[in-house]
Amino acid sequence: MAKKINNEYNDASIQVLEGLEAVRKRPGMYIGSTDSRGLHHLVYEIVDNAVDEALSGYGNEINVTIQKDNSICVADSGRGMPTGMHASGIPTVEVIFTVLHAGGKFGQGGYKTSGGLHGVGASVVNALSKWLEVHIVRDGVEYMERFEDGGKPVGTLKKIGKTKKRNGTSVTFLPDDTIFSTTNFSYEILAERLRESAFLLKGVKITLTDERGEEPKEEVFHYEEGIKEFVAYLNEEKDTLTPVVYFSGAKEGIEVELAYQYNDGYSENVLSFVNNVRTKDGGTHEVGMKTSMTKAYNEYARKVGLLKEKDKNLEGSDFREGLAAVLSIRVPENLLQFEGQTKGKLGTPLARTVVDNVVGEQMGFYLQENSEMSQSLIRKAIKAREAREAARKAREESRNGKKRKKGESLLSGKLTPAQSRNPKKNELYLVEGDSAGGSAKQGRDRKFQAILPLRGKVINTEKAKMQDILKNEEINTMIYTIGAGVGPEFSIEDCNYDKIIIMTDADTDGAHIQVLLLTFFYRYMKPLIEAGKVYIALPPLYKVSKGTGKKSVIEYAWTDGELAEVIDKVGKGYMLQRYKGLGEMNAEQLWETTMDPETRTLIRVRIDDAAQAERRVTTLMGDKVEPRRKWIEQHVQFTLEEDGSILDRSEEDTSAPTGESLLDAEKTKEAEQTDDTEISLFDIE
């Protein structure tokens, strides 16, 4: 449990910055979107308030309940919200829930460190709810206030009376279905987020309950070892090479915790947090950690003779191959600085120095005390350098590919290039098989669409060394075509295309190729996914036709639900064709349904939850059979006849994001310019 911080949390510590009028008009500005991601963000905002209390040492239990009517209740055992009158003349509770940017985290009064970095939590949740109720127990007295119709108080704060209940705040709300495209909460998404919070709040118990089914479902997340258990969780389905290592310390008001462990994989997985909020773009704290680790390893390598005087130092990425690490720091509000509006990157200069010192001091001793293990890790890093140099060579060759014989022979007869050389407009279609590749070549828009048929087998890059990956002809061709290098040498500025679109058959083989390609992009060209440049084409499953000649009617359907609507529209006498492969479509049909920017449907692949994405790749593509078997049993329904690809789901089914997915995706109907519909690529139910 966190050490108590002696800051007052009372009515005077609540500051008011501005009103709440704009939230319902422009909800996306406050919660990101009005799809499933935005819906779940409401829960995180209220949970973050409870986390702030726990961070400050008040309360060690948080309960989150999805109730039968799909409302959410978040209850904590903190001090209870202030219940007196605010300086503005209305109850403080009302200020917290009806005024934007009202909270105890803006001044130095309520919290020393705060997790709710945007600080708009309670009021925004209230504004976007049909109703919200807050129950407060403070100093032996219970209070309650209700809000309806987007945050309007029903009466005022009511004093219910004396109680023996413990202090705390309970917030229950029902999201407004006129604002959100879905109001169905995903148990899995909430579980993943709450598990992460519990790992970071050592000793705090977080309980998630789902009352919607016939039998209530409940999970308790409680980790006495904190981020040490988080790292073990990240590596749960991998073969590990070391125990979990843990360092902690504090300097100049900044608290530092680092846990890490090596596995036998070839990629690094570093998750960093500031005040319990994920910094997905890293920042000064992450730089400090990486710098100090690299320095400690190189100094030790020279001390034991694994690096000679004439040898160059190993690079940080060499030491981080197979590393799973969690860095969590607590920074006082007065030192907190972020780069950019998303607050995904820490900018506090002092954080780098503090993390560097704390980690550097302890790591030097640790390497000496664990000499045998340390030397084996350095030998591993030397092998990683060899792979990195091979990757750099591949990148250099891909940059000069058109001038080099190797590049020309690799691409000859495979790539059908676009006429334009504008990387901001060009699209690359990775197409399964020659027959579909032929139709795509004929049907494409030559100006900006390039076609690369995949003829041979794509290697499973999760299990392979870099040298073996670079020997795979299909992978090598993609590297040359994309033109931005691979692995640590990848540079998105050199990418030849704005969109890289995977186009496969709607069957098991097609789905497998999608997974293999996404695994490669995730492991070795991750910036492509982070920049939103990787897509999956969604060809139709059905063609419904009627009549011939000029009077003929042709309609397409992407799901069984759409098929029923199309059949009603076409009427009696229709002919039904079920597409089993892209090759069954002629060039015109392929263009019209799958390649024309005016009419096609694309799925943009996205990573929302880095820890979950890492585990999902390992589960589906790694060496261990048992985790994969269990996941398939839980998520794949087997039928006597194949119903199509894993993407063959109705929009209603696919609106939920990433609780159990490897990577997330957004479905974009480009012609309509509507809000993106979010789906999970491997979230199969």
UniProtKB/Swiss-Prot annotation:
Ligand binding (Mg(2+) 2): 505, 507
Domain of life: Bacteria
Gene3D superfamilies: 3.30.230.10, 3.40.50.670, Histidine kinase-like ATPase, C-terminal domain (3.30.565.10)
PROSITE patterns per UniProt: TOPOISOMERASE_II, TOPRIM
Residue stretches making up the Toprim domain: 426-540
Start-end of Basic and acidic residues biased regions: 389-400
Swiss-Prot/TrEMBL catalytic activity: ATP-dependent breakage, passage and rejoining of double-stranded DNA
Cofactor: Mg(2+); Mn(2+); Ca(2+)
Region listing for Disordered, in residue ranges: 389-427, 644-685
Residues reported in the UniProt entry to bind Mg(2+) 1: 432, 505
Site (Interaction with DNA): 457, 460
One GO MF term attached to the UniProt entry: metal ion binding
Biological processes per GO annotation: chromosome segregation; DNA topological change
UniProt keyword terms in alphabetical order: DNA-binding, Isomerase, Magnesium, Metal-binding
Disulphide connectivity of cysteines: none
Gene Ontology annotations for the cellular component aspect, listed alphabetically: chromosome
Residue ranges with Acidic residues bias: 644-654, 673-685
NCBIfam families assigned to the protein according to its UniProt record, in alphabetical order: parE_Gpos, PRK05644.1
Subunit structure: Heterotetramer composed of ParC and ParE.
PANTHER family per record: DNA GYRASE/TOPOISOMERASE SUBUNIT B, DNA TOPOISOMERASE 4 SUBUNIT B
Name recorded for this polypeptide: DNA topoisomerase 4 subunit B
Native source organism of the sequence: Enterococcus faecalis (strain ATCC 700802 / V583)
Annotated gene: parE
